[in-house]
Amino acid sequence: MHDKILILDFGSQVTQLIARRVREAHVYCEIHPNDVSDEFVREYAPKGIILSGSHASTYEDHQLRAPQAVWDLGVPVLGICYGMQTMAVQLGGKVEWSDHREFGYAEVRAHGHTPLLKDIEDFSTAEGHGMLKVWMSHGDKVAALPPGFKLMASTPSCPIAGMADEARGYYAVQFHPEVTHTSKGREMIERFVLGICRAKADWVMKDHIEEAVALIRKQVGDEEVILGLSGGVDSSVAAALIHRAIGDQLTCVFVDHGLLRLDEGKMVMDMFAGRLHAKVVHIDASEQFLGHLAGVTDPEQKRKIIGREFVEVFQAEAKKLSNAKWLAQGTIYPDVVESGGTKTKKATTIKSHHNVGGLPETLGLKLLEPLRDLFKDEVRQLGVALGLPPEMVYRHPFPGPGLGVRILGEVKRDYADLLRRADAIFIEELRKTIATEQDAAAGLCEPQQVGKSWYDLTSQAFAVFLPVKSVGVMGDGRTYDYVVALRAVQTTDFMTAHWAHLPYSLLGRCSNRIINEVRGLNRVVYDVSGKPPATIEWE
C-alpha cells in the first residue's frame, strides 16, 4: 500500500496543482470535496491533509469548512489561502476583510525557523530577513492567531501570511505554493509531504499505468470502445493506454472537421494505423461541421456546436460496432477545471471544453476518460512510459475544436485555409531555429537550453486568425487584408503560463514569410499575455 495524502478541495481553480506537486514528490494523493464525511477521512487514513484555496469568503459561506475529523485524526495539516483561513476560524482564530487585497506577485518575510520554511528563501534583506517570492490571491486575511499557533510569515499588507502549530503539525500559508509563480513552492510542499508527514516516496508512472489498465479493464469488460483521435498528445496517449488495456476492443475514429492543421489527416493515419497498429476509421465531416458553424460568432456556442457534432459522428460510427458501449476521450485536468467540472463541482467556469462541455445527457455511450486527473506533463510522462515515439509525445497540444477556436468570430473555410498555412510557417520556423549562446546571454533561454529548437523550448505555439483588416503596402500597391496573431507560451502544467520570449529575428522571419507566402494576410502581431490573466487559447 502507498502512503496517501488527502487534498480537500474548497473550489480553487488550481487545486489540482497541489496534487501535481505532491505527485512530483512521488507520493500518492487524491482530491476530494471539503464536505466529505468524518468517516471518509478516517477510513482514507492519510499521512497528511492539505486544505486548498477557494474563490469563496469565510464570511459568505459558513458551511465551507473542513470536517472535524481533520483536526481529530492527529496527522499534519497544511492550509493554503482559504485553507489557512478556515483553519484559523475552526481552531479559534479570527478572519476579517482586508482593506488591501493581494492578487499577484508578492514578497513574504519568513519568521520563526519553522520546519516548513526553515532555510528556504529567495533572497535576504539588508537586515538579514529571509524573503520569499510568492503568488497571492486573497481578499480576506487572518487577523488573530488561533491558540497554540505562532507567526510563520508576513507581508506589510498581510501581517499574518503564514502560521504554525508545530506541536500538532498544523501549518498554513496565505500564498499559493502550488503555482509556479511561487519559486520555492515545490520545495515547501515536498518538505511538508516528505519531511513533516513522513510519507514514502514510492508512487511512479509505472504504478499509474498498472492501476489505469486494471481500471479500464474492470470498467469496460468485454464491451467495445470508440475514441476520438485528433493527432494531439492527449488523444494519442489515451489511445495507447486503452489499447494496452483492451486491444482490438478499441476503435479509433479520426474526424476531419475541416479545422485541422496542414496535412494533419495524412500524418494521423500514418502514425496511428502504422505505429500503434490500432483500428482507425477516417471520416471526412468538414461540410457537416462548417455548415453548422456558419454565422456563429460566440465562442461558447462554437465549442458547444463542435462538441455536439463530434457526438453525432461518434454515435453514427458506434452503430456500426455491435458491442460499442463506451466513448473514450483524451480529456485532461486543465480541460476539466476550466469547465468547472472538477470532482467537487465547486470551481467557477472559465470556458467550456468540447470534451467536457459538449456532451448531451442523451448520449447513448458511457464516457471513458483515463487521463482526466492528469496534467499535460504527466500525460507526456505516461506516453513515454507506454513506449510512444517522441515526435508523438512531445508534439504541441492541439484543441479538440481545432482551428474553430483559433478563428475569432465566424468560422469560414477561407479563414481556416489562411490560418493553417500561417500556422504551418510559424511551426516550421520554430522547429528549424536553434537557441544560441546569444539568446542565452540576452536572457531568452537558459544556458543549458542552447542547441535546442525553439519548438522544443515552447510548450504550445500557434497562429490565431483575427477577422479584422488593416491597410498595408505591397510593391507599389495598397492592400487591405487580414491579420494573424502568433502565440507561444512556456509552462509545465498549462494551468499557468508565461508568454515565450522568442528572438526578434525568429519573429521577423515568421512575419516576412507569412505576409509574402499567404495571400490575404498583410499584418502579423505577437501575443505577450500570460495565463492568468489571459487563457492560452484566444477562445
From Swiss-Prot:
GO terms, molecular function: ATP binding; GMP synthase activity
Keyword GTP-binding: no
CDD domains in alphabetical order: GATase1_GMP_Synthase (cd01742), GMP_synthase_C (cd01997)
Family matches, as InterPro entries: Class_I_gatase-like, GATASE, GMP_synth_C, GMP_synth_GATase, GMP_synthase, GMPS_ATP_PPase_dom, NAD/GMP_synthase, Rossmann-like_a/b/a_fold
Domain GMPS ATP-PPase: 203-395
Catalyzed reactions: XMP + L-glutamine + ATP + H2O = GMP + L-glutamate + AMP + diphosphate + 2 H(+)
Keyword Cytoplasm: no
Subunit structure: Homodimer.
NCBIfam families: guaA_Cterm (TIGR00884), guaA_Nterm (TIGR00888), PRK00074.1 (NF000848)
UniProt protein name: GMP synthase [glutamine-hydrolyzing]
Provenance organism: Cupriavidus pinatubonensis (strain JMP 134 / LMG 1197) (Cupriavidus necator (strain JMP 134))
Gene of this entry: guaA
